Regions:
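Fe(II)/2-oxoglutarate oxygenase catalytic core
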Residues: 1-111, 116-118, 135-136, 158-180
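A short beta-strand-loop-beta hairpin characteristic of the jelly-roll/cupin
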Residues: 116-139
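Short, ligand-facing micro-motifs at secondary-structure edges
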Residues: 152-156
Length: 180
């Protein structure tokens, strides 16, 4: 809202601690390439490869058809080494509104893996699929395999400990939850 009372056509969401590692798709005449973070942090990018392999192995075990489908579609030059994944989106302590993911491989499933800096440091943060009226309590090391093109979200959460640093934006202590 402007000072004179008329509405702006812009909107601003809350700032989110998130990042992308891996590779961009080919777009607007640009070839596939590493995202800036991965290009600038080659050793850290390589450090994510064991996690990508572990998540790939979960997919292979739980949904072998999806694993083989995704494997048939990948370009081996643009993946985390020895995995089926080209990209990792990383969200820290972030509650999402109900949404559908875009940009993922159509006809495939997605993974959501939780890593906790301090185990059992929060209550809530359930991942929900509202159309199916189901929620999951995904915890440290767990991987959920689901269709992220379906509506999904996660719930509010309460941080139990003040052991971790505080968020500069909110002043609240971090839960220490990373969703990959």
């Amino acid at each position: 809202l402007y000072e004179d009372g008329h509405m702006t056509k812009r909107c601003q969401g809350n700032q989110v601690r998130c990042g992308v590692a891996g590779y961009f798709d080919k777009t607007a005449g640009l070839e596939c390439r590493k995202v800036h973070w991965s290009a600038a942090n080659a050793k850290k990018h390589e450090g994510l490869e064991p996690l990508a392999i572990t998540i790939s192995n979960h997919m292979k075990e739980v949904s072998p058809k999806t694993y083989e489908f995704q494997k048939s579609k990948i370009n081996k030059d643009y993946i985390f080494k020895d995995s089926i994944f080209s990209t990792m989106t990383i969200n820290y302590d972030y509650r999402t509104a109900t949404h559908r993911d875009k940009g993922d491989l159509e006809g495939s499933l997605s993974t959501l893996t939780i890593l906790e800096e301090l185990e059992d440091n929060y209550e809530g943060f359930y991942t929900g699929l509202p159309e199916y009226k189901i929620m999951f309590d995904i915890r440290n090391g767990d991987t959920l395999i689901f269709d992220a093109h379906e509506f999904h979200s996660n719930t509010e959460y309460i941080v139990k400990s003040k052991e971790l640093e505080k968020d500069d934006m909110t002043g609240q202590p971090f839960a220490g939850r990373m969703a990959v």
